[in-house]
Regions:
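Catalytic cores of enzyme domains
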Residues: 1-113
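Alpha-helical scaffold domains
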Residues: 69, 73-173
């Protein structure tokens, strides 16, 4: 119901890709409605972007808002974003099919580092952003969207010591 592909063998932590081969392969049988009565993803979604009929309102999806959307994030959704700077994946994290998934062994798909402090990101400038996230998918959202997301997460954190780092962006264009 989270609208992502679910494999009974691998769960829903998947990349959709295509490989061109000079041979024919046997088609898999698509599975339909692997979710049954489970609504865990709908229940956990912070913005209520998921619906029981397996539809999503991307305008409310935190992954869409923090990765794809380039405008100002609606005020009504900012608090629900919490500390998320790039994506969400709450719906994937709770999916029971992921009990079958295994961590990747491909180093290119691993996170760069564990959680960084918001202050670390608030001290970035555009050049450092490009250097730090070189060869990371985060680079593609661009500096403006990245710092927008960091500022929202910083505001949501209510960490008073971030105030001075946030203030420099009040007149930033």
């Amino acid at each position: 119901k989270h609208t992502n592909i679910v494999s009974k063998k691998f769960g829903s932590w998947l990349f959709l890709s295509e490989i061109f081969l000079p041979i024919s392969l046997e088609n898999d049988n698509p599975s339909i409605d692997n979710c049954g009565s489970c609504n865990d993803c709908i229940t956990i979604c912070p913005t209520n972007a998921l619906y029981k009929d397996s539809k999503i309102d991307a305008r409310k999806c935190i992954s869409y808002l923090t990765i794809e959307y380039k405008g100002p994030i609606p005020i009504s959704l900012r608090e629900k974003i919490g500390n998320k700077v790039y994506g969400c994946d709450d719906c994937l994290s709770i999916c029971p099919w992921n009990k079958f998934s295994e961590p990747t062994r491909q180093k290119d798909f691993l996170a760069l580092e564990k959680e960084k402090e918001l202050k670390f990101f608030l001290n970035f400038d555009e050049n450092f952003f490009k250097k730090y996230f070189f060869q990371s998918p985060i680079l593609r959202i661009g500096w403006v969207s990245f710092i927008r997301n960091v500022l929202i997460a910083s505001g949501n954190s209510q960490i008073k010591s971030l105030s001075s780092s946030i203030k420099k962006y009040l007149t930033h264009r």
